[in-house]
Amino acid sequence: MNAIAPTPDVRQHILDVAHPLLLQRGFTGVGLAEVLAAAKVPKGSFYHYFGSKEAFGEAVLEAYFTEYLGRTDALLTEAPGTAAQRLIGYFDDWLDSQTGDDAQSRCLVVKLGAEVCDLSESMRAALARGTRGITDRLARCIEAGRADGSLQPPPQAKEQDAQGIAVALYQRWLGASLLAKITRDRASLDMAMRDTRQLLGLSPDT
């Protein structure tokens, strides 16, 4: 019997269906049978698209970062305004996504990061690649802000390179998002925004 050729649309459909399930209950909390039932794909066909649940989890993360980095590019490079304004727009979008009603906009890194890094090296590597893609984009926007004069960092930050500042900001927002999830309170995210403006040398009305 001939093998069934993988169909990209079906593969993407499985990933799309799995995303909200994983956001809700995590990787280990969602069974393969549940994903297949939601996607209406038979178990036998699943293995034409993913060799294992681990490979499936890696593919979910890669699909998430592809979409997320595209949105990040739109906010940090394609949006109008100065580089400083684009940076604040990016973090405004982050804050809105973590406090709004759309559960599917939540950060998959916050949900899965600590859980899967000890379970799967391939998923940990996918997370590392994706998060590096984010901090690289933030660093480029910080460099653009220094070039266009819209970012004037305070004295304590002037010696830091753009990549170091980008990583510090990303760490701050990841931690704030996790704390907001634990406390069900946005105070940590509002504090992250204040800290971001301070680190970048921006006034509250930028």
Locations of the language-model features?
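N-terminal intrinsically disordered/low-complexity leader segments
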Residues: 1-9, 154, 206
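Hydrophobic alpha-helical connector segments
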Residues: 59, 73-105, 158-169
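Short, basic, alpha-helical segments at the C-terminal edge of helix-turn-helix-like DNA-binding modules
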Residues: 62-68
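Amphipathic alpha-helical segments used for helix-helix packing
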Residues: 86, 100-123
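Hydrophobic alpha-helical segments that form the core
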Residues: 105, 110, 154-179, 195-198
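Hydrophobic alpha-helical bundle segments that form small-molecule/ligand-binding pockets
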Residues: 119-121, 125, 131-162, 202-206
